[in-house]
Design a protein with these regions (language model features):
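Beta-lactam-recognizing serine transpeptidase/beta-lactamase-like catalytic domain environment
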Residues: 1-197, 243-254
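Noncatalytic linker/hinge segments flanking ATPase motor cores
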Residues: 17, 23, 170, 197, ...
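Short, gly/Ser/Thr-rich active-site loops of penicillin-recognizing serine hydrolases
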Residues: 112-116, 129, 206, 210-254
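Short alpha-helix boundary/capping segments
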Residues: 120, 173, 200-211
Length: 254
């Protein structure tokens, strides 16, 4: 299976194998480099840093070596990994823009915006963004039902277990956390949205995906309306009409 199809089909087994080959410390290097496990610096109090586990972390906290089997869970974002929606939105924006990490703010525009860069190859960015585009826009993609007309929405769903399958069966519950993160357009993205729906029985694409889709659609609807209004205001004044304009629809004249 190719990387593209693994992203489009959301194939956990593919990424189990990738995680096994990389090892936990390399996963932690890329995860931390893209902002996981650290505060984003958004203008909100008590921001949680989340957790990107590593061998030094487990030795410091639990005083034992890292178990290789845990790498498999971390490779698909489970196990000890914890993230916030704003971290995922920031990470997705960084990947889509070639590695530029933006500090988020609660305002329309920041002329002095601070950024940092994490090195990502052009080939890596292209392959990942093509995969994320396929998730929404290729038949068989796990979020094909979220595609939008004339908008290149790219995205990825995620479904996080809240407990083991055995515990869930004992308690008679299958509730999960449903995630979706999306950006648009595919080239030079200008909006990124991350959503989580907690304690749901639906997967991320069904639970959180429509939230992201609707926000992106509303953004473009408002943007297009503003552009249309600007074009109308800037249009030259029309010359006065000197004779009446007559339109006939379905009328027979004698």
């Amino acid at each position: 299976m190719s990387l593209h199809n693994a992203i489009v089909d959301s194939c956990d087994v593919f990424f189990y194998n990738v995680g096994k080959q990389l090892g936990i410390d390399k996963i932690a290097y890329y995860g931390s480099g893209l902002g996981l496990g650290k505060r984003t610096g958004i203008d909100l109090p008590s921001e949680e840093p989340g957790l990107m586990p590593s061998e030094p972390w487990v030795e410091r906290v639990f005083h034992h070596k890292w178990y290789a089997g845990e790498t498999i869970s971390v490779a698909i974002g489970q196990g000890a990994v914890t993230v916030t929606p704003i971290q995922l939105a920031r990470m997705a924006a960084a990947v889509a823009s070639g590695g530029t990490l933006v500090r988020p703010h609660l305002l329309k525009n920041d002329p002095n915006m601070k950024t940092e860069n994490f090195p990502l190859s052009d080939n890596t960015v292209e392959q990942v963004t093509q995969g994320l585009y396929g998730v929404v826009n290729e038949g068989g993609g796990t979020a094909y039902h979220l595609r939008l007309q004339n908008i290149d929405l790219c995205g990825k769903s995620g479904t996080a277990q809240l407990m083991s399958y055995d515990a869930a069966n004992r308690m008679g519950t299958k509730k999960m956390d449903g995630w979706f993160v999306g950006f648009a357009p595919r080239r030079n993205p200008e909006i990124v949205v991350a959503a989580i729906v907690q304690d749901t029985v639906e997967h991320g694409g069904e639970a959180a995906g429509p939230v992201v889709r609707d926000i992106v659609k509303t953004y473009y609807d408002k943007k297009n309306a503003r552009m249309q209004q600007t074009a109308t205001n800037d249009a030259p004044a029309q010359p006065p009409i000197t004779k009446p304009l007559v339109a006939t629809v379905g009328v027979q004249h004698p």
